[in-house]
Amino acid sequence: MATVNEFRGAMSRGGGVQRQHRWRVTISFPSFAASADQTRDVCLLAVTTNTPTGQLGEILVPWGGRELPFPGDRRFEALPITFINVVNNGPYNSMEVWQQYINGSESNRASANPDEYFRDVVLELLDANDNVTKTWTLQGAWPQNLGQLELDMSAMDSYTQFTCDLRYFQAVSDRSR
């Protein structure tokens, strides 16, 4: 069994614990969805998310009466980001405009140029001095699911928030090969 000092040493060698609240997300909104000021505000109002997951598929090869699992293709799941909503609905509206541009509720039409709506999103982990310790870039991201704003007449001491699931082609990190 390790001693407390060995445990503390392992933590110290790694730079201390990674605080759960030390992160930032940078969404490069399309120009039609948000101005530079709106983009900055939306990024500041992001309150929860996860790191991107990477999953390898499985290829089952029958051999000798068994199935041998071999690694398959890499898959990426949508990344949920929860935002605080403000009175002017800026964060929600920016995501909604972006999503409507991809496929409008009324027009049922998409933009002619997908390069206009596929955008990179950068997620960074930070240390206590705001130095970046790890980076992921979600390449070709777009808002797949724009969550609801929960409204409640009996709510007190709370605010509205919503979650947007970003779908993307792939996530690359500072350790990707």
From Swiss-Prot:
The keyword Phosphoprotein does not apply. Belongs to the T4-like viruses Gp19 protein family. The keyword Phosphoprotein does not apply. The lineage of its organism: Viruses, Duplodnaviria, Heunggongvirae, Uroviricota, Caudoviricetes. It is found in: Virion. Keywords: Late protein, Viral contractile tail ejection system, Viral genome ejection through host cell envelope, Viral penetration into host cytoplasm, Viral tail protein, Viral tail tube protein, Virion, Virus entry into host cell. This is Tail tube protein. One of its GO terms (cellular component) is virus tail, tube. It comes from Serratia phage KSP90. Structural component of the bacteriophage tail which consists of a contractile sheath, a tube and a baseplate. The central cylindrical segment of the tail consists of a rigid tube, composed of multiple copies of the tail tube protein. During infection, contraction of the sheath drives the central tube through the host outer membrane, creating a channel for DNA ejection from the capsid into the host cell. Disulfide bonds: none annotated.
